[in-house]
Amino acid sequence: MVIVASSNMLRPDRIWLCGKYQTARTLYVVGNKSKRRNPSLEDWARSDSDRKMKLQQQEYNRKLKELKNLTANVSKMISKKSEKEVERSQIQSTEPSPETSTQLTQKNDSQRLDFLAKKSLFIPVVDIPASVSDRIGLAFKYLVSKSSQNWSMVLDQLEKNGGFKDIPSKDIRKFVYQIPKPHIPPIISRLKKMHHDAGVPVSPKLVNVFIDSLLLSPSIPSSVMSQIESYCDSIRSTSKKGRLPRETYELLIRAYGKNSNLEMVNSILTEMKQVGLQPSKNTFENILATSVYKSKDHKQAVEVFDTMKFLSDKTKPAERAYRDIIVSYVNNDDIEKALDLYNEMVENKVEVSQQIMVALARGCISRPELKVKAWEFIFEIYNQKWEPTIQTLEYVLYLAAKDGDVALCRALVNKLSETSSVTVRSFSFLLLGYSKSSLYNESPSIPPILAHENGIRFRRNILADSSYAPSSESSLPFLPVLDLVTEKEILAESSAMWAYANTIRPDLINIESANTYLNIGAKFGSLKEFLDRYNSATLLDRQGVPDTRVIEDENLAEVSVMDYTSTASVRSPLLDRNHTLKVPRDDMTYLIALKAASKARNYEFSQEVWSERGLYRKSDRIRLSQEQKRTNLIFNLQSLWSQL
C-alpha cells in the first residue's frame, strides 16, 4: 500500500468543508487492488465526449456562416439606401399637405373605431356558429370571457330559446367543440338531454368528445369506466356490425390503460385487428405508457417499443415513446441501455426533453462512475434554457441527497418552501439526504456537483442565498446553521421535521418517509433513539391476523436496551404528544429494525421484530399486496438474522 500526499482539491491548497474554505493537506491511500471498470460505460463516456466536440465544431461553422451572411446583407442595405432616398424625394412631390393628411387619417380612424365598437357587441370570445349564437344572444359575450367561463349558464340561455331544435347537426358539433375539455364532464347529461329534446341523435364524434373529456386525470376509477363503456355501447348500437370508429378504439385503449386493465387493452387490440384496423402511433404510445407507469411491466414495454421501431415509418418512436422507455430502463436499473437510447435519439435527431434529462440523471446517480455525468444531464437543462419544473427541482434534490450533500438538500427544500412547493416527494428526499449524510462515512468525499464549473456556481449561489431564520409559524424548522456537521444535529433536525409534518403537514407522511425517518435513527442514533422513532411513527396493522393466536400488547420501549452510549434520545418536544400519526409497518420497516438491532447487538429486540414480522406476513395488508418484490427482502432479512 502506498500513501500519497496531495494538496490539489478544487483549488491549489483548499478544500470545501462545511460551507467554508479551510487550508488542508490531503492524504490519498492507494491500494494494491485494481478498481473494477465498466468498459461499456467508459466507451459511452468517450463517444459522448467526441459527439460534443463535433457539435461544438458544427455550432462554430454555423455562426461563421451567419456572420458572412450578415456582412453580405449589410452591403446590400448600404447599396439600396441611396436608391430609396431618390424614390422618397419623388414621392414627396405627390403627397398631400400634412394638414390634409392628418384630417383624413383622423376621420378614417374614427369611422373604424365606431364600426369595431358596434361589431364587438356581437363577437364573442369563443367563435361559435351563428345559428347557436343568435339564440344565446349578447349574454354569451359576458358568460364566456378570458377571465371566466360559465357554460352551464350558456346552456340555460340556449334552452330558454329553443335549445338545439332546428339547428343543423354540424353547427351543434362545432358549438360543443368550442367548450374546453375540463368544462365538459359536468354538462354531458344536459347536452345529451338537449339532443333528445331536439330529436337530434348524438353523433359518434360528439361521444368521442365526451369520452376524451373524462380521460384528463392520471387514473380512471371503475365508475367512470362504466360510463365510458355505456357511451361506446351507444355507438355500437347504431353502427354496422357493432364496430367502433378508430378514434373511439384509441380512446378506449387509453381509458383502460388509465384504469390499469391490461386485459381489456389486449381485448380492444384484438377487436381492432378483427375489423382490419392497424393500431396507430398514438395507440402504441398509450400502451407503452400503461406498461411503464401503471402495470410496471418492463418486458412488455420493451416489446411495444421495438414493435413501434420496426413496424412502419408511421409508428417510429418520437420523444414521448423514447421518454417512457428510458424511464422504464432506469426504473429497472439498466442505465447502460437508457444511455444507448439517448445516443440513438441524438443520432436520429429526435427531440430531447427536460423529462428525459431528469430520467437519465436519476439513472446515472445509481452508478458511482456516472455520478458526475448525472449532474451534466441536469445542467444541460439550464444550457437549453428550459424552465425547470417542480419535478426537475425535486430530482436535483434527489441527486444531492444521494450524494450525501446535506447542505445543498436543506437549501433546495428551503427554496421550495418559500413558494409553498414542498411535496411528499421533496420531503422524503430531504430525509434521504439526512440518512445519506457523509458523516456516516469514515472518509467523507467531495460532492460530485463540484466537478462542474456550473455546479460550483449553482451550489455556491444557492447556499449564499439561503436563510434559515423562520419567517412564519408554518416555516420548516431548520436549525439556524448553513450545514449539519454532527450526528446530534442531524437527529435533532430530522426529529423537528417529523414533528412539523405531524402537526402542520400530515399529508407529507407516508410509509416511504417514515422508513427513511427510522433509518436516520438507526444510522446516527442509539437503539433507544431508534425505538423512540419506531414506536411513535409506525405500528403493526393487525387487520386479518388470526384471532386464535394470543397477542399480548408489547411495549418495545421496555425491551432491555443494551446501549451504553446514550441515555436520552434527541427528539422534538412536539412528539411527546400521544396523537402523533403512525403508518402501518412494511417489510422495509422490519429490515431497518433488524439492522438497528444488529448494530446494537440486542438479541431481545431482534426476536421481538422477527416475531412481529411473522404476524405482519399473515395480515390482510400483505395478502392484498400485489407487489412482487418480497423474495429479495426475505433473503436480506434471513441474512441479517444469521448475523445476530
Curated annotation (Swiss-Prot):
Keywords: Mitochondrion, mRNA processing, mRNA splicing, Repeat, Transit peptide. PPR repeats lie at residues 245-279, 280-315, 318-352. Its main location: mitochondrion. Residues 78-108 are annotated as: Disordered. Disulfide bonds: none annotated. Residues 1-38 form a transit peptide. It is found in: Mitochondrion. The keyword Mitochondrion applies. InterPro entries: Mito_RNA_Proc_CCM1 (IPR051114), Pentatricopeptide_rpt (IPR002885), PROP1-like_PPR_dom (IPR033443), TPR-like_helical_dom_sf (IPR011990). Belongs to the CCM1 family. Regulates mitochondrial small subunit maturation by controlling 15S rRNA 5'-end processing. Localizes to the 5' precursor of the 15S rRNA in a position that is subsequently occupied by mS47 in the mature yeast mtSSU. Uses structure and sequence-specific RNA recognition, binding to a single-stranded region of the precursor and specifically recognizing bases -6 to -1. The exchange of Ccm1 for mS47 is coupled to the irreversible removal of precursor rRNA that is accompanied by conformational changes of the mitoribosomal proteins uS5m and mS26. Binds to mitochondrial small subunit 15S rRNA. PANTHER family: MITOCHONDRIAL GROUP I INTRON SPLICING FACTOR CCM1-RELATED, PENTATRICOPEPTIDE REPEAT-CONTAINING PROTEIN PET309, MITOCHONDRIAL. This is Mitochondrial 15S rRNA processing factor CCM1. It comes from Meyerozyma guilliermondii (strain ATCC 6260 / CBS 566 / DSM 6381 / JCM 1539 / NBRC 10279 / NRRL Y-324) (Yeast). The lineage of its organism: Eukaryota, Fungi, Dikarya, Ascomycota, Saccharomycotina.
